[in-house]
């Protein structure tokens, strides 16, 4: 999508001696995935890994102000982009029989949602669930799956509006309330960790065969609160009068 930065990244890798194939890709377009997969196979012969990294912030609004176009954009990029990536690349990995890896980039929001982030939260939770499912499905074929769940990282996701296609434009996109939220988000992201640190953490985690990859251990206590609430809810169900007659309780 960002041709200029794609060229900069490609040049940097080539100068360090890394073979590169730089292709623009709209991850929400399955046909473009197929095109890139074909080009990658021709360039490298064998493909061993796909990193589903593309993501957008989407609209940040209350539940009663959400619009279909905003939801659709977030779903198509954050969720269907991951689905198309795996659907397209897994057959290539299976084809050579040497095993490989799927790395899906979710978010801490996939472990516990934040206020007014309905569409974003939903897609990231879905990516976590997909990763868990695929990890179990593909392990027998020596294909590993990991899901990266970072908190704030110094990226431009707060400015993903710049890449929103016109067919996904909503009344909310570009509004003052939306811009205000982006400005607040930018401040938090600017104080996040460097992308290079995340990259090193991912390499470390893959070497260890980790399914869940976390980059912000200070969020552990917040996630523990959620899982404690879930555990407490199970305890409540054990005391349920309504469930006493259920054979599956």
Residue ranges and their predicted role:
Residues 3-4, 24-35, 68:
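The beta1-alpha1 cofactor-binding region of Rossmann-like NAD(H)/NADP(H)-dependent oxidoreductases
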Residues 61-63, 67-72:
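Substrate-binding pocket helix/loop in short-chain dehydrogenase/reductase
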Residues 86, 123:
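Active-site helix of classical SDR
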Residues 107:
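Residue(s) in the substrate-gating loop at a strand-loop-helix junction
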Residues 112, 133-143:
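Active-site-adjacent segment of SDR/Rossmann-fold oxidoreductases
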Residues 112-118:
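Active-site loop immediately N-terminal to the catalytic Tyr-X3-Lys motif
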Residues 140-213:
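SDR active-site lid
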